[in-house]
Design a protein with these regions (language model features):
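Conserved beta-strand signature within the Rossmann-like core of class I S-adenosyl-L-methionine
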Residues: 42-59
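Hydrophobic/aromatic anchor residues within beta-strands of the central parallel beta-sheet
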Residues: 1-3
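A short SAM/SAH-binding and catalytic strip from SAM-dependent methyltransferases
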Residues: 5-10, 14-33, 52
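Short, structured coil segments at secondary-structure junctions
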Residues: 41-42, 86
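Class I S-adenosylmethionine-dependent transferase superfamily signal
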Residues: 37-38
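Alpha-helical subdomain
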Residues: 33, 48, 66-70
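Conserved Class I S-adenosyl-L-methionine
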Residues: 60-84, 86-161
Length: 161
């Protein structure tokens, strides 16, 4: 589906055995309505992946570095509670991802979407470049830049209908 999940309707999509929503529900405001639609579309199973609690370490630390308020997405337990209140008793699994994110350059690290460059002014972007230069180190095997603070952390929420 090539549109935002919060904009889909059951009437235009119809029934499917499985609905998979990977990394597409973080930050959606009408989350309960979106979950109801997803649940209605699915005949057998729903699988959702969300950012886990460790996913935002580097962003949180950067905001502290520039003394800016951190505004994180609601954590996965928020969605779990909404599902529970809807009568859906979902399974939760934290996916064990071992690799750190790697970047070919500071620019790539800045532009990966994690830092929301569109919300930073020029001074904050310069501070971000400085911050990344301080914390990123080169992987001797791959030659790419990484930090232990920037590791993917994913939560799988699923249920059987």
């Amino acid at each position: 589906i090539l549109k935002s999940l919060e904009d889909i309707t059951y009437e235009e999509i119809g029934d499917y055995d499985v609905v998979l929503a990977s990394r597409s529900l973080n930050g959606i405001i009408p989350i309960e309505e979106t979950l109801k639609t997803i649940n209605k579309i699915a005949n057998k199973y729903v699988f959702i992946t969300l950012f886990g609690p460790e996913n935002w370490k580097i962003e949180k630390e950067f905001n502290e570095y520039i003394e800016k308020e951190n505004k994180p997405f609601p954590e996965y337990n928020y969605m779990f509670n909404i599902l529970y209140n809807m009568g859906i008793y979902a399974n939760i699994e934290r996916l064990d991802i071992k690799a750190y994110r790697e970047y070919s350059s500071i620019e790539e690290a800045m532009d990966n979407g994690k830092f929301r460059l569109d919300l930073l002014n020029d001074d904050e972007k310069a501070q971000l470049r400085k911050y990344l230069n301080e914390i990123l180190k080169k992987n001797s095997e791959t030659g790419k830049l990484y930090t232990e603070k920037d590791k993917a952390d994913w939560i799988l929420i699923s249920w059987k209908k």
